[in-house]
Design a protein with these regions (language model features):
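Transmembrane beta-strands of outer-membrane beta-barrel proteins
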Residues: 22-28, 66-68, 97-99, 145-147, ...
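Outer-membrane beta-barrel "beta-signal"
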Residues: 277-279, 355-369
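Short coil turns and loop connectors of transmembrane beta-barrels in diderm outer membranes
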Residues: 18-20, 62-63, 93, 141-142, ...
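Outer-membrane beta-barrel biogenesis signature
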Residues: 8-25, 37-39, 289, 324, ...
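Sequence/structural signature of outer-membrane beta-barrel proteins
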Residues: 31-39, 71-77, 106-108, 113, ...
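Outer membrane beta-barrel
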Residues: 17-35, 42-156, 188-192, 276, ...
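Detector for outer-membrane/organellar transmembrane beta-barrel domains
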Residues: 189-305, 313, 367
Length: 369
């Protein structure tokens, strides 16, 4: 579809009339994965295979904007999916409006970590999340802020009793509850030249519609965050809290909710605090094929409000090697009660499975264009 659209635009004769501008981007990535809790993987010495192909489009026509990020994962991980896609209006260099599947303004932007796996907040739907709605953004010299209303998360089925589909990139509430009517606000203040700093705060409030009781529960989240950049150093810190109050039918727990992405739903504690610290240092190279290497360590802690639950932790140590259009992430990811880094897939819930730290060694190799 993207190539057809580009062909049609190129077919227009040159009449002096302003035409839409389109620019394509994307990447192809492969992954090597060695997980210490998977006996088969250990005996094989790990596995190397296809990760994903991304095709993106950035477009403009006068003051109208277009941005599309479409992902092609393996079929078991959700297959083809729209990560984000919106139509916007640029009032001027500082004010912009976006409508569609647009990024939720919450937490450090665009990411709170340096590694391939993001921060722990991503797996709880509070980092790199996009939902269906409308968003206003302002970007000044010192201040930046955003306000948004999201009608719901990515909706695909449109049935009166349809659960949230699992073939999505970002984590959303699923099962018998659905995210609806969500408001977000975010503000940043930045200063400094040689040493740049940025502080910010984020707030979120919305409803959880239960398909069984047909009643609306509520959910909220707040965060404060700070970023520091000095020469090659990058330091990102964030404190977040969230709570979900679903209106489930009698007999169903309200202390755990279901969230889903990549066709793999799991249980998550309904209330928790999140603490994260991410540090990186970049070394540039002026000769040879390698442009730079960034070393980093990113730590995240999910502190669950329910004292009978076990907290979740993750720590990722690694480096990003950049050689022109080729990016290579080399990560040693450790987790305690973290489903992506351990044997218990519902560890973000009660966390009553393995009480040992587990590790995943991962290499992501990609060509970006």
């Amino acid at each position: 579809m993207f190539f057809l659209l580009a062909s049609l635009l190129l077919a227009f004769p040159s009449t002096g009339t302003e035409l839409p501008h389109l620019k394509f981007n994307g990447f192809l990535r492969f992954n090597y994965n060695y997980s210490d809790w998977k006996e088969g993987s250990k005996k094989r010495g790990g596995d190397f295979g296809y990760d994903l192909f991304k095709l993106g489009v950035a477009g403009s026509y006068k003051k109208i904007l277009l941005d599309v990020d479409f992902r092609f994962y393996a079929k078991p991980s959700g297959g083809a999916m729209l990560k984000s896609g919106w139509i916007g209006y640029k009032f001027n260099a500082r004010h912009q409006l976006q409508a569609g599947l647009t990024r939720v303004p919450f937490g450090i932007q665009p990411y709170g970590a340096h590694n391939y796996f993001f921060q722990i907040a991503y797996y709880l739907g509070l980092e790199d999340d996009s939902d269906m709605g409308i968003k206003y953004l302002y970007a000044g010299d010192r201040w930046e802020y955003a306000f948004a209303f999201f009608k719901n998360s990515e909706e695909e089925l449109f049935g009166s009793d349809s659960e949230t589909a699992g073939d999505r990139y970002s984590y959303d509430v699923a099962g018998r509850n659905k995210e609806v009517n969500q408001f977000n606000g975010q503000a940043f203040y930045q200063w400094g030249d040689e040493t740049r700093q940025k502080i910010g705060a984020s707030a979120e409030f919305g409803m959880l519609y239960n398909l069984d009781t047909e009643k609306n529960g509520t959910h909220y989240a707040f965060a404060v965050h700070h970023e520091l950049y000095w020469k090659g150093l990058s330091l990102k810190t964030q404190i977040s809290t969230y709570a979900m109050y679903p209106k489930n039918k009698p007999g169903e727990s309200r202390d755990i909710v279901t969230m889903t992405a990549f066709n793999a739903p799991y249980e998550v504690a309904a209330k928790a605090n999140i603490y994260s610290v991410s540090a990186g240092y970049t070394i540039p190279f002026s000769k040879g094929i390698v442009n730079s290497i960034q070393f980093y360590n990113d730590f995240g802690w999910m502190q669950k409000w329910d004292k009978s639950f076990h907290d979740s932790f993750q720590n990722v140590t690694g480096c990003l090697i950049t050689a022109g259009p080729v990016l290579c992430y080399v990560d040693y990811a450790q987790g305690l009660h973290q489903p992506w880094f351990g044997p218990d897939w519902n560890a973000f819930g009660a966390g009553t499975g393995s009480n040992a730290w587990h590790a995943r060694f991962n290499i992501s190799l990609g060509y970006y264009f």
